[in-house]
């Protein structure tokens, strides 16, 4: 029987080292998380700045980083996108693994540097559809696939939000929401930002869903960062929180 030489084994080892991963093989992470931010017309430039800076502060918060690194794989994958009118959405930061403080800091720094994508009307349904598409093409693998959608008004563009929500849930996606409130006296469209029953109730009934789905309220855009920090800790840890209904 002929045995491979030491040189042959060495060459085989070198070849294996430079051979790209098999197509379709995805890196394991504890969660795939899409952060979907509303940049419709009701989000003024000052509010937009608060949102971006708040999101950067939240992802780099020590308690959030601790939650990220506490799972079995000690990392999650995140994609940040913005949305407005139906068909109007853009990936701001494509899929990246966050596995500690340094990676979180790089993500946050990039986030505050990127320009605003656009502004327009409000299509939560289109945002959900686009977010699901990003989850489907992620180069990472995780059992938990979560959309974290933030918004300050109800769906007024495109198809209703609930059917888009239901289709996402059928694919095993969890949708949580950060509901940004607007005092009615400051709203240029009170029926949009302050619908009957309240905006949080609207999101609970039409947007969120899946095991343990929940909403967190930001009383104003100024509290966006604090609210998102609290939300991410619960989301990443997978802890039970206030669920829909």
Positions of predicted regions on the chain:
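Solvent-exposed loop/turn segments at secondary-structure junctions
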Residues: 39-43, 85-88, 151-157, 180-185, ...
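VWA/integrin I-like adhesion module and closely mimicked acidic/polar interface patches used
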Residues: 154-202
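C-terminal "exit" segments of structured domains
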Residues: 215-245
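Short beta-strand-loop
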Residues: 74-110, 190-196, 200-204
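Second-shell loop/turn segments in exported
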Residues: 36-46, 94, 111-121, 151-155, ...
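N-terminal secretory signal peptides and thylakoid transit peptides that target proteins
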Residues: 1-15
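Von Willebrand factor
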Residues: 27-94, 105-150, 179-189, 195, ...
């Amino acid at each position: 029987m002929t045995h491979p030489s030491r040189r042959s084994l060495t060459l085989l080892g070198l070849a294996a080292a430079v051979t790209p991963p098999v197509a379709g093989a995805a890196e394991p992470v504890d969660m795939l998380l899409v952060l979907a931010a509303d940049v419709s017309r009701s989000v003024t430039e000052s509010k937009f700045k608060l949102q971006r800076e708040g999101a950067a502060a939240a992802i780099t918060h020590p308690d959030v980083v601790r939650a990220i690194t506490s799972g079995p794989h000690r990392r999650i994958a995140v994609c940040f996108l913005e949305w407005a009118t139906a068909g109007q959405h853009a990936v701001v930061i494509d899929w990246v693994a966050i596995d500690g403080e340094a990676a979180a800091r790089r993500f946050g720094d990039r986030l505050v540097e990127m320009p605003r994508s656009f502004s327009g009307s409000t299509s939560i349904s289109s945002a959900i559809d686009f977010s699901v598409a990003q989850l489907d093409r992620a180069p990472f693998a995780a059992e938990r696939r979560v959309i974290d959608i933030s918004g300050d008004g109800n769906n007024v563009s495109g198809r209703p939000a609930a059917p888009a929500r239901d289709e996402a849930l059928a694919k095993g996606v969890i949708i949580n929401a950060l509901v940004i409130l607007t005092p009615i006296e400051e709203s240029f469209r009170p029926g949009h930002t302050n619908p009957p029953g309240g905006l949080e109730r609207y999101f609970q009934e039409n947007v969120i869903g899946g095991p343990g789905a929940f909403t967190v309220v930001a009383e104003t855009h100024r509290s966006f960062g604090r609210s998102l920090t609290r939300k991410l800790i619960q989301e990443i840890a997978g802890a039970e929180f206030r669920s829909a209904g």
